Amino acid sequence: IRCVSCGEEYDDDEVIYTCEKCGSVLELVNEIDVSKDIFDGRKDNLWKFKECIPVDESKIVSLDEGGTPFCKCDKLGDELGVNLYVKVEGSNPTGSFKDRGMTVGMTKAMELGVSTVGCASTGNTSASLSAYAARAGLRCIVFLPSGKVALGKLAQAMFHGAEVMSINGNFDEALEAMTALALEKHLYLYL
């Protein structure tokens, strides 16, 4: 894990959200050397490429995300002069592209041995986190800005057993409150 601003490096076995030196965003640096032939014949989901994802393979938490269909976009493709396809990410388990990152994040949470995960969300993240936490058997706490979340997404979080708390304010205020809780109670925060 490396800071995008100052280059400070951190081990991937510690829970850290921003650079302790300068406060900037962190990035995962993953240098891999695998033959693409190993992916042939595997089930078409995100974990088809497990060698490219730096986690303990025995801890994988999956709902069979990824492998979503392609949709050909003839009109726009013709206009741009290209053969254009888009992915139908609504085919993921919770109906969002967020599931792709969540499977990796939840797998990392299991690898780190955490018991509680949390997020601030306006919908898709809370739905995804709660589904993956339920699959992993982890406690899930979700902070939502009051009145700013689609009922379907709220229902998904509750259906999966998340502890949902409404925060008076906007998303940024919900995130600030969740970050404070995560630091105080040592829960794994999904950003």
Show where each model-derived region lies.
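PLP-dependent amino-acid enzyme catalytic core
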Residues: 1-191
